[in-house]
């Protein structure tokens, strides 16, 4: 059994253990949880994972340490189809034309669900700073969620509604990434955000918060800024990064979906062989005990 339930994996794997499931894998995908009224219960569940799982996997070092503490774990990088996101100039021009973005406008992009930890409202302050200094710029949000209305209201309060595009959930994310000039993620915390990896695969400069793990930064054009830095500083870095031309296509081999599939298949086969050997040894021990 391979559980991707974060803190709740311990509960599910505990039931699997009681029913004799021999291989029980817990997979960590986050580096934190909101400190709401449910957090003490989640923290309790998290602590039982090393006792109910036979194997521990994580999307990154930070996620593994947060979820499993000092218990040993294996990092299995998150997988993306890198070819799907390879930069296409024609696709960029077509999408910018469709979105109504001129050549002179700077387009900042973000892909993600509208949740508290995603902190999208911070990007509105960044856009406000950019426009206040005379930069023709717009902000593009791809995704939906419970906090979307609040972010839209904040945009209206700042007088930014004409300059912010809320596209909702889309199937053409690669084309939308190509249309962007800079990708931003100001999250309070993350595990290994797929959107940041996809943006890097598309060749975009990426600016992320210190809530995003450093091992997510895989190209020279990806960098971190603390959330304690003012929006004006983020605006300054975004403007500087948007003017730097990419010298070569990015290489994200360790995150390539084919490589990831090979790694996971090899891991499953290894565990199956290990289980068969343990079962065989157990049978032999019982035979010798009966003699």
Question: Where would I find each of the regions flagged by the language model?
Answer:
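A charged, aromatic-enriched C-terminal amphipathic alpha-helix characteristic of glycosyltransferases
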Residues: 84, 243-288
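Aromatic "clamp/platform" in nucleotide-sugar-dependent glycosyltransferases that forms part
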Residues: 169, 188
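Short His-centered aromatic/hydrophobic patch
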Residues: 3-9, 28
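A conserved mid-protein helix/loop that constitutes part of the nucleotide-sugar donor-binding site
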Residues: 106, 110-131, 135, 146-152
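Donor nucleotide-sugar binding/catalytic pocket of nucleotide-sugar-dependent glycosyltransferases
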Residues: 51-91, 224
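Short hydrophobic beta-strand element within catalytic cores of glycosyltransferases
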Residues: 196, 205-209, 214
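Nucleotide-activated donor-binding/catalytic signature segment of Leloir-type glycosyltransferases, i.e.
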Residues: 152-168
